A protein has these predicted regions:
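Short hinge/loop at the helix->beta-strand junction immediately C-terminal to the helix-turn-helix recognition helix
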Residues: 30-31, 60, 65-66
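A short alpha-helical element within helix-turn-helix/winged-helix DNA-binding domains
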Residues: 36-47, 61
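Short, hydrophobic-biased segments on the C-terminal half of alpha helices
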Residues: 22, 58-59
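Short, Lys/Arg-rich nucleic-acid/phosphate-binding segment
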Residues: 37, 66-77
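Conserved segment of winged-helix/HTH DNA-binding domains
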Residues: 81-95
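Extreme N-terminal segment that seeds HTH/winged-HTH DNA-binding domains in transcriptional regulators
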Residues: 1-36
Length: 95
């Protein structure tokens, strides 16, 4: 599991920060295939943001095949491998 944190001063939209943190968590092995993510509501409360922001991040990642959402069960890391280029890794590490 990873700890989510938003940078209020970065200028990067919150949903994009969530997407980046999940992708980096998977690539770095901190999030494993099949691992359940916090519910939309729980993550929104934790980050003090609108649930629609979390929902958009999860939806974007689901469209990419990175997350699987199972109605009534939760959102899980897909078993599909995620490739992140070196430039993107450096950008994520700077955040």
């Amino acid at each position: 599991m990873i700890h989510f944190k938003l940078d209020l001063k970065s200028g990067v939209p919150f949903h994009r920060q969530i997407v980046d943190q999940i992708r980096f968590g998977i690539a770095s092995g901190r999030l494993l295939p099949g691992e359940q993510l916090p519910t939309v509501r729980d993550l929104a409360v934790q980050l003090e943001i609108n649930p629609n922001t979390v929902r958009k991040a999860y939806s974007d990642l689901e469209l990419l095949g990175i997350l699987d959402t199972q109605q009534g069960t939760g959102t899980f890391v897909s078993h599909q491998q995620v490739e992140i280029g070196d430039a993107e890794k450096r950008r994520m590490l700077k955040q």
